[in-house]
């Protein structure tokens, strides 16, 4: 689960991570009132969406008067912001964050992620603040300093010193930087985050470090421990189909292809997408019906897949272990009664009650259901059907 910048900064403040003063606003007049409360003669108005690259897309602007704050906010609110992370459809701006201006002397990058290879949280820093960190990693990976932090000992001074020396900080800057990094580590661990990014982390004219931007993502499986974080969830920023799928215990991720996929098990689902691409097709989604699949969830899965107008065929690939194939077959029949299944459906069922399932589908005599003998055969047929060649 992701949250907005203003929400991440609220959490930072709780833990003593320095951030500029600011407040969220939902209208132009509200933005003006926020700027008036903050005082000063320079403010930043930031569109609040769950995506990076806002500055380049016109979602971050400076204002030098209260009138300008209100005008910029009114222009941003309601606009659709398209960045490299939103996709071509973009995201609608429903709130803005008004923040006091800062005296920026130097920009850095500071972040934390879970590194699966070392099986530890890793803190990363770079002198290339303000740039896309993925671009830095691809072109100049030597400019990213990393420290793996063993949770059994936590963040130590030597972790901070390695990062500080790598950034080339002056002697008097090292201690405040280490204090900043230590507070950030505590946020990450206490809140069960799986991502924190501060880009940029700035050094001000008076030598302070401030989180000028803030991005946080959380482990969904740990949200039950953090009702305060769960309340920050903004469903309007999430794919509505994915939200609907989660209500039924389905793991769904929308993709750009035209071959719909319904599979049990994440590993088999990824293998299915791989072989579809190998056969010259493009998967339209990732859909794992899980081990508790029943006719109702299968029917719902079809409804979700068919809500994508790009889908030209569906590949149902089930290996029955915990999931019984006859339940999947009955779910397919139920789906044809509840939803207009107007595309070819290639079905490969193997494992528990597979023969019974095959008989159920055969007796139903539904013309657009195409049986497949194995994974490769199913992928070939699904790709061919999507191309209108079957």
From Swiss-Prot:
ATP binds at residues 46, 53-55, 99, 102, 107. It catalyses: succinate + ATP + CoA = succinyl-CoA + ADP + phosphate; GTP + succinate + CoA = succinyl-CoA + GDP + phosphate. The keyword DNA damage does not apply. It comes from Nitratiruptor sp. (strain SB155-2). PANTHER family: SUCCINATE--COA LIGASE [GDP-FORMING] SUBUNIT BETA, MITOCHONDRIAL, SUCCINYL-COA SYNTHETASE BETA CHAIN. GO terms for molecular function: ATP binding; magnesium ion binding; succinate-CoA ligase (ADP-forming) activity; succinate-CoA ligase (GDP-forming) activity. Keywords: ATP-binding, Ligase, Magnesium, Metal-binding, Nucleotide-binding, Tricarboxylic acid cycle. Transmembrane segments: none annotated. Mg(2+) binds at residues 199, 213. Succinyl-CoA synthetase functions in the citric acid cycle (TCA), coupling the hydrolysis of succinyl-CoA to the synthesis of either ATP or GTP and thus represents the only step of substrate-level phosphorylation in the TCA. The beta subunit provides nucleotide specificity of the enzyme and binds the substrate succinate, while the binding sites for coenzyme A and phosphate are found in the alpha subunit. This is Succinate--CoA ligase [ADP-forming] subunit beta. The keyword ATP-binding applies. Substrate binds at residues 264, 321-323. Residues 9-244 form the ATP-grasp domain. Pathway: Carbohydrate metabolism; tricarboxylic acid cycle; succinate from succinyl-CoA (ligase route): step 1/1. Heterotetramer of two alpha and two beta subunits.
């Amino acid at each position: 689960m992701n949250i907005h910048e203003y929400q991440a900064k609220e959490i930072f403040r709780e833990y003593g991570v320095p951030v500029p003063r600011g407040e969220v606003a939902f209208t132009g007049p509200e933005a003006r009132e926020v700027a008036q409360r903050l005082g000063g003669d320079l403010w930043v108005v930031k569109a609040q969406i769950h995506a990076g690259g806002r500055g380049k897309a016109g979602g971050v602007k400076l204002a030098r008067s209260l009138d300008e704050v209100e005008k910029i906010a009114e222009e941003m609110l309601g606009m659709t912001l398209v960045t490299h992370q939103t996709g071509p459809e973009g995201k609608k701006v429903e709130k803005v964050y008004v923040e006091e201006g800062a005296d920026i002397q130097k920009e850095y990058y500071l972040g934390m992620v879970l590194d699966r290879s070392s099986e530890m949280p890793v803190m990363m820093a770079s002198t290339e603040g303000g740039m896309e960190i993925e671009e830095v990693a691809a072109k100049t990976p030597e400019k990213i300093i990393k420290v793996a932090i063993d949770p059994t000992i936590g963040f130590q001074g030597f972790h901070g010193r390695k990062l500080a020396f790598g950034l080339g900080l002056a002697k008097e800057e090292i201690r405040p930087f280490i204090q900043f990094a230590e507070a950030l580590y505590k946020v990450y661990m206490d809140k069960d985050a799986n991502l924190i990014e501060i880009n940029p982390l700035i050094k001000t004219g008076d030598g302070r470090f401030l989180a000028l931007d803030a991005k946080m993502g959380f482990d969904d499986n740990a949200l039950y421990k953090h009702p305060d974080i769960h309340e920050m969830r903004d469903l309007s920023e999430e794919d509505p189909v994915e939200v609907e799928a989660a209500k039924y215990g389905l793991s769904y991720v929308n993709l750009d292809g035209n071959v719909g996929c319904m599979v049990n098990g994440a590993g088999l689902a990824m293998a299915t997408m791989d072989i579809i691409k190998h056969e010259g097709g493009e998967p339209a989604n990732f859909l794992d019906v899980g081990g508790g699949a029943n006719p109702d969830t299968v029917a719902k899965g079809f409804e979700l897949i068919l809500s994508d107008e790009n889908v030209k065929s569906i590949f149902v690939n089930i290996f029955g272990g915990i999931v019984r194939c006859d339940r999947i077959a009955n779910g397919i029949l139920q789906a044809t009664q509840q939803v207009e299944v107007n595309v070819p459906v290639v079905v490969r069922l193997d494992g528990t009650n597979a023969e019974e399932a095959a008989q159920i589908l055969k007796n139903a005599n539904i013309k657009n259901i195409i049986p497949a003998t194995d994974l490769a055969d199913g992928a070939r047929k699904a790709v061919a059907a999507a191309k209108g060649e079957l």
